[in-house]
Curated annotation (Swiss-Prot):
Binds 1 Mg(2+) ion per subunit. The lineage of its organism: Archaea, Thermoproteota, Thermoprotei, Sulfolobales, Sulfolobaceae. Mg(2+) binds at residues 44, 46. It catalyses: riboflavin + CTP = CDP + FMN + H(+). This is Riboflavin kinase. Keywords: Flavoprotein, FMN, Kinase, Magnesium, Metal-binding, Nucleotide-binding, Transferase. The gene is ribK. It is an enzyme of class 2 (transferase). It comes from Sulfurisphaera tokodaii (strain DSM 16993 / JCM 10545 / NBRC 100140 / 7) (Sulfolobus tokodaii). Pathway: Cofactor biosynthesis; FMN biosynthesis; FMN from riboflavin (CTP route): step 1/1. Its EC number is 2.7.1.161.
Length: 136
């Protein structure tokens, strides 16, 4: 089976810190280890897409199968499902684009997880351009 690769370019942007909260929840930590093969750093790297081709590729992800982290019910809350796509960012892997079922981000903003603190590993600051390869 051949892997299809989508390319998405964008610029690093600051988030609200919500990724850190969700990636500290044991259910998500264990699920990402199980389904993606790595324990994610407790935070996401947010990327804003600014070109047409990258945005079209991002929209393809809405229709693509991806890896589904199922919804999880706890006594006081429901943890929403997440669709994930194995990826690399500036040739660093493992990484994954994560698309939560419930998000406040527009389609032009994507979230990346990795076992690494990507801002440090790639020496990134807000406004820096990155290239993501998404493996379908």
């Amino acid at each position: 089976m051949r892997t299809k690769i989508l390319h998405i370019k964008g610029k690093v942007t600051a988030g609200l810190g919500e990724g850190r909260i969700f990636l500290s929840i044991p259910y998500y930590i264990e699920s990402f280890k199980k389904y993606l093969g790595f324990e994610p750093y407790a935070g996401t790297l947010n990327i804003v897409i600014y070109d047409r081709i990258s945005l079209e590729n991002r929209l393809i992800l809405d229709l693509a199968k991806g890896i589904i982290i199922p919804e999880h019910k706890e006594p006081n809350r429901v943890l929403g499902s997440v669709k994930a796509f194995p990826s690399s960012i500036n040739s660093i892997s493992p990484a994954a684009i994560v698309i939560p079922a419930r998000t406040t981000h527009p389609k032009s903003v994507i979230e990346i997880i990795s076992p690494y603190y990507l801002r440090e590993k790639l020496s990134l600051k807000d406004g820096d351009e990155v290239e993501i390869e998404v493996y379908l």
